[in-house]
């Protein structure tokens, strides 16, 4: 795995370590994290988001005429959106049809505008991997579709 800037915060959540990168999207990267206890290895997913995404994003916002203080407040608003998401995810915890939120860390950068948001979640096998490993029968496909619809009810 290439160098991961989030390793500087290890151990995460007191005892978790980043082991592999799963992927990335518009809102950040996703990693496998592990914790070892009494000979047992526990795994979770870590969604890592940096706000702003890079220094160019700060420059872009400030080039629109915002002061450093105003830019900080702008990005703080984006962070607040994620905090609201944590609250919602926490309320949905325990629903068998939705990925389980476990914990989060919100780390404000020193001496610059920025935050790192780390979200520990249940580690699941991607649907495409499940279907590639075995041919699903019609009954299994129907159950999967029903489960997805139940998740959307929330």
Labelled PLM ranges:
Residues 36-83:
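ATP-binding glycine-rich loop module of kinase domains
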Residues 122-132:
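Structural motif in protein kinase domains
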Residues 144-145:
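Activation segment signature within eukaryotic-like protein kinase domains
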Residues 100-115:
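Short beta-strand micro-motifs within the conserved protein kinase catalytic domain, predominantly
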Residues 1-11, 19-20:
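Juxta-kinase regulatory segment immediately upstream of eukaryotic protein kinase catalytic domains
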Residues 87-96:
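Structural motif at the C-terminus of the N-lobe alphaC helix and the adjacent alphaC-beta4 loop
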Residues 19-26, 30:
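Protein kinase glycine-rich loop
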Residues 150-154:
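Protein kinase catalytic-loop region centered on the HRD/HxD motif
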């Amino acid at each position: 795995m290439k160098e991961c800037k989030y390793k500087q915060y290890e151990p995460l959540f007191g005892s978790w370590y980043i082991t592999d990168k799963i992927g990335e999207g518009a809102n950040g990267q996703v990693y496998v994290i592990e914790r070892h206890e009494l000979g047992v290895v526990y795994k979770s997913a870590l969604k890592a988001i940096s706000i702003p995404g890079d220094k160019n994003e700060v420059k872009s916002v400030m080039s629109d005429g915002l002061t450093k203080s105003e830019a900080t407040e702008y990005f703080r608003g984006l962070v607040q959106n994620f905090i609201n998401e944590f609250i919602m995810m926490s309320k949905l915890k325990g629903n068998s049809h939705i990925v389980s939120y476990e914990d989060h860390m919100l780390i404000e950068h020193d001496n610059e505008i920025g935050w790192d948001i780390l979200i520990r979640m249940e580690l699941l096998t991607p649907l495409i991997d499940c279907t590639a490993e075995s041919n699903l029968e019609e009954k299994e496909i129907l159950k999967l579709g029903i489960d997805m619809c139940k998740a959307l009810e929330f």
